């Protein structure tokens, strides 16, 4: 249904001088998709409110809604090219007016878990890379063909978006930071067997592959309304340091069916282990933490086992934040069990002593 539209968007991006890598293509597709999704969501909520005789308070001001600037329509439903911005006017509006307006939501939001805060965070962390307002106009019209109304439409969009993430992961450079092969993720989920009511966590979530696949695993069968609400609101938490990965994670979870993803833009390793309380702990942890990274000495001071290897720091964090009786599946490099350095030996001992009452798949 939407596969050709995604191909058309990619063709536009490949011809755009401001976009040169698969990471750029995914980034630009992501912010456009997000704004189209947000407009569809608001239109749906407004209609639902109208049906029960209530007024809906829009998040986005009318002048900056998708239907006003990206795809103004004629009465027959076709794009009104007489009123649609194009060329330098479109680029000027996006860079000087739209993005600053959207960035301002972060300061105006009442708390970090609101959609308003996430809007501000997303548009504070990415930028418009389109240099040609004609290319952007073409991309907008293709994006406008996409719909987020039905579960079937979201399902297809999620698969197409996952394909873009996979291409980005295979593109070299730092693309692998964003993508874990889905067969590996599904195998780990089958072993750990999360259940409805578990709180599931990934402290290095990348594109949120583990969280999305856990959602797909848990939503199978005939769930009650209460169970569906639990999945939507009280199950998944992700943390991500990289700006682009944060944006992709939110969009990926939205396309899989989580309306307000609890993805936090932060460096997990800067959190003090001694501050973690029982209420902060999780029943299930999935993660593929980055290997070979380095953290500043002051960050390493948060951990009892001092090491510059970020994967080992993440393991200590996961041990601390996993509930007693909890289960974890973590990808770790294959030399971990044979390395003879002090940090590896100490961490293996810590796993043996601290995880007797927890199940871990490493």
Model feature map: region roles:
Residues 36-42, 168, 208, 218, ...:
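A generic secondary-structure signal for well-formed alpha-helical elements
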Residues 1-196, 264-271:
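Non-catalytic, mostly N-terminal accessory regions of nucleic-acid modification and defense proteins
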Residues 175-287, 292-294, 299, 306-308, ...:
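Conserved S-adenosyl-L-methionine
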């Amino acid at each position: 249904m939407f596969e050709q539209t995604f191909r058309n968007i990619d063709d536009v991006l490949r011809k755009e001088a401001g976009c040169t890598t698969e990471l750029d293509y995914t980034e630009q597709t992501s912010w456009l998709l997000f704004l189209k999704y947000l407009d569809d969501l608001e239109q749906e909520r407004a209609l639902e409110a109208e049906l029960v005789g209530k007024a809906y308070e829009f998040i986005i001001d009318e002048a900056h809604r998708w239907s006003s600037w990206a795809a103004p329509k004629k009465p027959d439903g076709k794009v009104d090219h007489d009123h649609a911005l194009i060329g330098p006017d479109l680029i000027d509006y996006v860079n000087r007016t739209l993005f600053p307006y959207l960035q301002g939501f972060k300061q105006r939001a009442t708390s970090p878990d609101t959609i308003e805060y996430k809007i501000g965070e997303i548009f504070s962390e990415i930028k418009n890379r389109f240099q040609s307002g004609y290319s952007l106009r073409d991309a907008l019209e293709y994006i406008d063909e996409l719909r987020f109304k039905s579960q079937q439409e979201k399902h297809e969009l999620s698969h197409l978006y996952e394909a873009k993430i996979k291409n980005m992961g295979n593109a070299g450079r730092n693309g692998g930071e964003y993508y874990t092969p889905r067969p590996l993720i599904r195998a780990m989920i089958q072993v750990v067997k999360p259940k409805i009511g578990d709180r599931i966590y990934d402290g290095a979530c990348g594109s949120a592959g583990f969280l999305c696949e856990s959602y797909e695993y848990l939503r199978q069968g005939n769930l009650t309304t209460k169970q569906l609400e639990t999945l939507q609101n009280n199950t998944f938490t992700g943390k991500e340091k990289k700006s682009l990965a944060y944006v992709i994670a939110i969009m990926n979870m939205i396309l899989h069916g989580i309306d307000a993803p609890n993805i936090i833009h932060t460096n997990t390793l800067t959190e003090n282990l001694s501050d973690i309380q029982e209420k902060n702990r999780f029943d299930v942890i999935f993660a593929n933490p980055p290997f070979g990274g380095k953290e500043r000495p002051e960050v390493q001071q948060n951990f009892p086992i001092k090491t510059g290897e970020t994967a080992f720091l993440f393991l200590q964090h996961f041990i601390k934040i996993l509930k007693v009786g909890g289960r974890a599946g973590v990808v770790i490099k294959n030399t971990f069990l044979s390395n003879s350095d002090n940090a590896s030996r100490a961490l293996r001992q810590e796993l043996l002593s601290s995880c007797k009452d927890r199940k871990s798949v490493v």
